[in-house]
């Protein structure tokens, strides 16, 4: 092919123009004469009258919950490549902020994340994967800002109530221990700490938290509140001077680019501390592009944080693929660098926390928006977006209709900015597949005639970044392996003496916490997987009454699931294995499938749901606590059978809905139990 440059790229080279004199070989291609007939607007970028608000950075959330669960299982080099796309400066998303869940043992959207203190006298700062993720982010960007926020809390904090504010000092102690543990065990400095995600705040608790932070020498840790709506936190700050003094940032979720009067009057930094939450298609990318600009223009928000960082959880869980990129196949190594990565780069690669917005930002006459930021040292970055309504709808809130049309936009630099003579140009086109182009560097734009003016031809669903910085880069790696379904023959004996992570690969805990465990006296089952909660957490979502961890392929139909099980609780204890489990995450209480239970009282049950409301079969089983048993569950078509220690216990049980789903293990209640030698043979 004589010219391999993408057609869209060729077209865009003709979209940037300047009337400035200069080397003809280095200016952008002039516009066609017919383009002069397109309506246009004039916009001034000026720092003469001072600057706007300080920019605090763009980031993403890991957790809320278990959204990075599968990432840790990826083999190298693919795991490191994914992390580079997220965190490496001037490579991909180049995020400024990483916000993580402070695991509290409860279901928090797509799974549970373990607490550092399951019980009052228990402390372990190596559970889960958020510590690891923060360290990996810091390796790539030592300046990345770290935030922690609880969604759920371990049950012991509630003293019998599902409420974290029963003992304010105890809850503050619990959170501060997490911050201290991050530093002591992982050399991680937490910069911001939150209160309780999307749940009520207690003003006295916030004051107590500040007091305890200061007592522990953590004056540098700032408090963000309340990670919910703008109200009532904003009015509370205005009415309570002591509370106003201890809150550094008002963080709102899914604000729709707008704030409220009380928040503005507070004088506090305003953040969209959780936003996006949209499938990472080009529509999701359009959503992300629009709110990155307009959260500041419309709402004075100086930071926007996406939920979630990377879609590393089974896609059929709630909000599948709602990360900046997708990495949900550690068994194959396949991942997808989705378009929100490159939308992020338009801002993150050319700004830093501590820069300032210009006062002269706003909306374009024919739809779209522009912001400009400076470091005060002569550098300038301008980000322009023209996202159409159709291609930028976020999952929430409702987006009123608006129109974007073809237009010319003339920008004039004034004040100290007029000294700028050249701008690097980066371009993205979203919208239809035939037009898409992600983060393409165009020709340098020269401003040599002293006017400080340039004109852009803008169409729908475009992003331009014009910047004095020359460090931008579209990083890349060779294509990852092809996508493959979860292996249909899978087994895990949990024989890991020194596990790198507390959880077994690919198991996704949906209620309860399942961790590697070592028996000191049982040689045959020395290394096992153990459900470690004996008390219901202070929940954020509707956790099930039974604990459960799912694994495999949601499309599995026929399967044989086998596992050695050990009930630790006499008389009332029970465990199960299951197949065709159809739901998880915040919907786990209503999960259906085929559940094969045995109980320490010498009985068994086969149910159609996790809650045990529909019973297929039941009867006597030679089972007691404190002994190992091998359970086998077979499902084929409309029939199922169950075996205990290799002997048929029940058979020819007719099963109906659902027709497919994951395999699973779990316990009857929040109780200790162990699992070993798990295996599944399945078919899609």
Swiss-Prot record:
EC numbers: 3.2.1.46
Matching Pfam families: Glyco_hydro_59, Glyco_hydro_59_C, Glyco_hydro_59M
Binding site for substrate: 109, 151, 197, 396
Main EC class the enzyme belongs to: hydrolase
Active site as annotated: 198, 274
Secretion signal span: 1-42
UniProt KW keywords: Disulfide bond, Glycoprotein, Glycosidase, Hydrolase, Lipid degradation, Lipid metabolism, Lysosome, Signal, Sphingolipid metabolism
Family statement drawn from the similarity comment of this UniProt entry: Belongs to the glycosyl hydrolase 59 family.
Summary of the function given for this chain in its UniProt record: Hydrolyzes the galactose ester bonds of glycolipids such as galactosylceramide and galactosylsphingosine. Enzyme with very low activity responsible for the lysosomal catabolism of galactosylceramide, a major lipid in myelin, kidney and epithelial cells of small intestine and colon.
Name by which UniProt lists this protein: Galactocerebrosidase
